[in-house]
């Protein structure tokens, strides 16, 4: 008999590529009050690629950019949007406005209004197709 593999194990075995073509990443938040890693540019609302805005901006690590087949130059000039697919349903559509440190695959959601305890620790991200309203 064959053993059944759940979705999370399948994503892990495929190198982090989900069945929807997205990439599994760690989901973190930045820019909230008392953020222990807040820097002066974030405090001013400045991202590496564009100004930061609530309900719009995210920061990606270089490894997440590479997994999505993006370069820093592409992000600077094209201002791509991503879809963050949350476990259990729901999608956040956000623009890449900043860089996140560290080497792991991670999306850092800009939350100046406060830390959002309802967001999960992991999500699947993909490039957004189509226009953004």
PLM features: what roles do these ranges have?
Residues 17-133:
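Secreted/periplasmic proteins
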Residues 1-17:
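N-terminal secretory leader/proregion of peptide precursors and effectors
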């Amino acid at each position: 008999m064959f053993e059944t593999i759940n979705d999370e194990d399948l994503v892990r075995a495929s190198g982090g590529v989900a069945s929807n073509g997205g990439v599994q990443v760690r989901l973190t938040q930045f820019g909230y009050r008392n953020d222990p890693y807040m820097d002066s540019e974030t405090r001013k609302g400045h991202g590496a690629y564009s100004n930061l805005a609530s309900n719009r901006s995210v920061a990606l690590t270089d490894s997440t950019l590479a997994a999505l087949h993006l370069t820093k130059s592409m992000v600077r000039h094209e201002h791509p949007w991503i879809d963050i697919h949350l476990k259990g349903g729901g999608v956040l559509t956000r623009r890449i406005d900043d860089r996140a440190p560290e080497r792991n695959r991670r999306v850092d959601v800009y939350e100046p209004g406060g830390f959002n305890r309802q967001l999960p620790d992991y999500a699947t991200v993909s490039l957004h197709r189509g226009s953004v309203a």
